[in-house]
From Swiss-Prot:
Highest taxon of source: Eukaryota
Record's protein name: Adenosine 3'-phospho 5'-phosphosulfate transporter 2
Subcellular location per the Swiss-Prot or TrEMBL entry: Golgi apparatus membrane
Keywords: Golgi apparatus, Membrane, Transmembrane, Transmembrane helix, Transport
GO cellular component: endoplasmic reticulum membrane; Golgi cis cisterna membrane; Golgi medial cisterna membrane; Golgi membrane
Pfam families: UAA
Record flagged with keyword Mitochondrion: no
Lineage: Eukaryota, Metazoa, Ecdysozoa, Nematoda, Chromadorea
Keyword Protein biosynthesis attributed: no
Alphabetized InterPro entries for the sequence: SCL35B1-4/HUT1
GO MF entry, a single one: 3'-phosphoadenosine 5'-phosphosulfate transmembrane transporter activity
Length: 363
């Protein structure tokens, strides 16, 4: 090799190069937090979940406290779907793509059940004690388990079945407590929220099955399911005549209807995205723990901020549901939880070092 070649190689090696950044971006409300310490990422994402969803729950209950709002749950859902669709399109256009992978007919089915889930859930708030609605939404495992068996032919173990039984017991206890203390007990609310849970179970199974089959992304599913769902809801509110009563009511109270609905919808959309990011970064177990604590705080704040009757039976029922949720989590993460339990017991008994060396299950 000549001196000139060596000089050329050395010079080229000293030139600045564009090195590909291997750190995968982690977006929180448009900001990349990938280079922040892990503990700070957890604090930021968890804090965002609490703020967004506590605000979402507060706005949802506040809207239905408006005199005369009770019959217009589907109009509120229409506004929510339009905003979700617009946000979904903007997100896909900027960060992803709007290409459709899943067939239209599948999206028609997904959109129908998405409409049923969110529409019935929103409408039920007008007829239910809000904490009861939150407790019911915590118990999605029951219809998901049934849907998994019927739609995908899945088989579940005794732990999952036990969790579903405990959830059913918790719901029954909450309903009986509601019936005991609520002066405006209305069975229509329970029918609506039960229908929402059943539809939600069907959605999850259909989405999972077809996203795997056709390779569709979660962003694509949000865009098309909410877009088509908006058309479904608009057709329904026109044919039922609800829209013609809702428009004068919304215009008469424009800030407290359109304003609250916009805030409610944006908080909901951002909340969904933050939860998905939390799952991606820290896993489903940690994310479910955070969201479960958030739901518990939502129930507490509902009792503090909005006057409603209270009984200690609510606490008992909520505790049973919480136990069922973590029993279900244990079923999904049995191997890792068993490992952590063994380590904890070993440390507590003072033979951690010996156990980790000799017990093959501790390795």
């Amino acid at each position: 090799m000549t001196v000139a070649q060596i000089h050329s190689d050395c010079s080229s090696s000293m030139l600045p190069r564009h090195i590909k950044d291997d750190v995968e971006p982690i977006h929180l409300l448009g900001f990349n937090i990938a280079r922040k310490p892990k503990w700070l990422q957890f604090v930021l994402l968890s804090g965002a979940i609490f703020i967004l969803y506590l605000g979402y729950g507060y706005m949802q209950e506040l809207i239905f406290k408006l005199p005369g709002m009770k019959p217009f749950g589907w109009t509120l859902t229409l506004i929510q779907f339009v905003i979700y669709s617009g946000c979904g399109y903007a997100e896909c256009a900027v960060w992803h793509n709007t290409k459709r992978m899943i067939p239209w007919r599948i999206y028609g089915v997904i959109a129908f059940f998405t409409v049923a889930t969110m529409g019935l859930s929103n409408a039920s708030v007008g007829y239910l004690n809000y904490p009861t609605q939150v407790i019911f939404k915590c118990c999605k495992l029951i219809p998901v388990l049934i849907g998994g068996i019927l739609i995908q032919g899945k088989r579940y173990g005794w732990i999952d079945i036990s969790a579903a039984i405990l959830m059913s017991l918790g719901i029954i206890m909450f309903t009986l407590a509601d019936n005991k203390v609520s002066p405006n007990f209305d069975s229509r609310g329970y029918i609506m929220i039960s229908g929402a849970l059943l539809a939600d179970a069907v959605i999850g199974n259909i989405q999972e099955k077809n996203m795997k089959k056709y390779g569709g992304s979660s962003n694509e599913v949000v865009l098309y399911s909410y877009g088509i769902g908006s058309v479904f809801i608009f057709t329904y509110v026109v044919l039922s005549g609800e829209i013609f009563s809702a428009i004068p009511f919304f215009l008469e109270n424009s800030w407290k209807t359109f304003g609250y609905a916009l805030i409610f919808s944006f908080l909901g959309y951002l909340g969904v995205n933050v939860v998905l990011t939390h799952i991606k970064v820290f896993g489903a177990l940690v994310a479910v723990t955070v969201t479960t604590l958030r739901k518990a705080l939502t129930i507490i704040l509902s009792f503090l901020l909005f006057s409603k009757p209270f009984t200690i039976e609510y606490v008992y029922a909520g505790s049973v549901v919480m136990l069922a949720i973590y029993l279900n989590l244990y079923s999904k993460n049995k191997a890792s939880w068993d490992h952590m339990i063994r380590i904890f017991v070993a440390r507590a008994m003072g033979y951690h070092a010996v156990a980790t060396k000799k017990d093959p299950m501790m390795v």
